[in-house]
């Protein structure tokens, strides 16, 4: 059994390295980077265009403009009418969409490989020739405001998380919601969106990731043909905003119509800045897997099944970002239990790791689970493009993705115990509590993915 497990891990590690073994890269004269990962398992191709611009680059009073511009990118150019982009991709037998984060904005198409040239032409066209029409903007800003109502204002958990971030970060722009504050959306104009586009949507602030059944030399030639003629432009200097050190616990209580209370404990946590030299982010990722990486992990086993103090309990930690990091413990108390009971139980589980450490068996299983999840990401062409694009977006080299897996596998039980002692302290803690209020009779509308 032990030999079978070891073989599976080694095989998975080998597959991970192979999956990212052949990316090829070139940089056009205008500064646009083209990254190609050949994968000939299926006759399809994925194109992802990543702009190094997200909500973190916005200013107070203009929150949400990055996301609004993402919507406007589907409203046409002089040669492609409003909504025509989606129709052409669908007619080619493909799918497309886009997403905005704190750190980047990305657009993708997955199409039969022979249609790659068509979607490359479409993306190159809107990279510099977007039409920001005032009437189209007025319609789309209403769509975005409704999206905010659905995803945040009518979603108590999302509202709590938004308020927590606004308190946890006092100076850094991560305090602002990606979708924007409603007042900023109400006062935003087409000129604001156009200024954002003109400033940041240039080849030297973007990179293109293409994966699939393609030849990298042929892709480079297509990129030169369609993206090459676009002119680059000097970018404004980005002034880094440093978050002041937190000097005590902060608490946020949100009252909203809901059936159940929710608790979130948010701790300031390190971010991966150097893949080779850093160690704590890997150990925290492993700790998260031990606490909440599978059905038999500590939170589910102890808090949900055995002690029945929680209906659910989990942990969220992303160790890559342009800005500062947070680690969140969260849950909903069981019937007859309070938020205070749940907070005490979560703290007790962290204290147990701090005092007793973790077992070799737990660490072994967590490593296997983490490795399996990473391999799963790389199983699809879209997943490979996402993995490459996201790591580049936060300033880390995609060439070292396999090194990240190696570093995870080297995390020791002592490393896990050390980070539990180091980062779970109350001076770096923000506590958020959702206090449920009587339901108002309005239907609680679930958030839905926006289709452009």
How would you label these PLM feature ranges?
Residues 18-22, 246-248:
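Short acidic, Pro/Gly- and aromatic-enriched capping/linker segments at domain boundaries
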Residues 149, 166, 235-296:
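His/Glu-based metal-binding/catalytic segments typifying zinc-dependent metallopeptidases
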Residues 20-51, 55:
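Mature N-terminal segment immediately following signal peptide/propeptide cleavage
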Residues 27, 84-235, 253, 263, ...:
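Charge-rich, well-structured scaffold segments of protease-associated domains
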Residues 46-49, 262-267, 432:
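Active-site-flanking beta-strand signature of metal-NTP-handling nucleotidyl enzymes
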Residues 23, 47-110, 176-179, 293-309, ...:
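M16/MPP (pitrilysin/insulinase) zinc-metallopeptidase core fold and M16-derived inactive scaffolds
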Residues 1-20:
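Gram-negative bacterial Sec-dependent N-terminal signal peptides
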């Amino acid at each position: 059994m032990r030999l079978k497990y070891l073989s599976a891990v080694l095989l998975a590690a080998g597959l991970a390295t192979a999956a990212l073994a052949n990316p090829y890269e070139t940089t056009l004269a205008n500064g646009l980077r083209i990254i190609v990962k050949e994968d000939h398992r299926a006759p399809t191709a994925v194109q992802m265009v990543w702009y190094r611009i997200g909500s973190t680059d916005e200013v107070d009073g203009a929150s949400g403009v990055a996301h609004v511009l993402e919507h406007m990118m589907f409203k046409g150019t002089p040669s492609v009418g409003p909504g025509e982009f989606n129709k052409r991709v669908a007619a080619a037998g493909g799918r497309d969409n886009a997403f905005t984060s704190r750190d980047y904005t990305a657009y993708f198409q997955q199409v039969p490989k022979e249609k790659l040239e068509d979607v490359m032409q479409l993306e190159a066209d809107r990279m510099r020739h977007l039409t920001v029409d005032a009437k189209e903007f007025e319609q789309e800003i209403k769509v975005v405001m409704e999206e905010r109502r659905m995803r945040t204002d009518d979603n108590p958990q999302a509202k709590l998380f938004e308020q927590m971030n606004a308190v946890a970060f006092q100076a850094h722009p991560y305090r602002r919601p990606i979708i924007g504050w409603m007042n900023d959306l109400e006062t935003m104009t087409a000129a604001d969106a156009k200024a954002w586009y003109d400033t940041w949507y240039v080849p030297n602030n973007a990179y293109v990731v293409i994966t699939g059944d393609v030849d990298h030399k042929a892709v480079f030639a297509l990129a030169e043909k369609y993206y090459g003629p676009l002119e680059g432009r000097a970018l404004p200097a980005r002034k880094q905003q440093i978050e002041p050190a937190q000097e005590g616990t902060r608490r946020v209580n949100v009252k909203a119509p809901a059936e159940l209370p929710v608790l979130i404990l948010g701790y300031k946590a390190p971010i991966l800045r150097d893949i080779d030299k850093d160690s704590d982010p890997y150990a925290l990722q492993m700790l998260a897997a031990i606490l909440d990486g599978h059905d038999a992990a500590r939170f589910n086993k102890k808090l949900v099944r055995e002690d029945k103090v929680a209906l659910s309990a989990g942990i969220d930690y992303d160790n890559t970002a342009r800005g500062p990091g947070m680690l969140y413990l969260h849950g909903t108390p069981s019937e007859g239990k309070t938020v205070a009971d749940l907070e005490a139980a979560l703290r007790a589980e962290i204290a147990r790791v701090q005092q007793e450490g973790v077992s070799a068996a737990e660490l072994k299983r967590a490593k296997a689970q983490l490795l399996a999840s990473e391999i799963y990401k790389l199983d699809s062409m879209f997943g490979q493009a996402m993995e490459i694009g996201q790591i580049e977006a936060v300033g880390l080299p995609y060439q070292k993705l396999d090194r990240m897996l190696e570093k995870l596998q080297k995390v020791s039980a002592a490393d896990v115990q050390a980070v539990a002692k180091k980062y779970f302290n109350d001076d770096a803690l923000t506590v958020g509590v959702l206090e449920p209020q009587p339901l108002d009779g309005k239907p609680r509308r679930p958030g839905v993915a926006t289709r452009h």
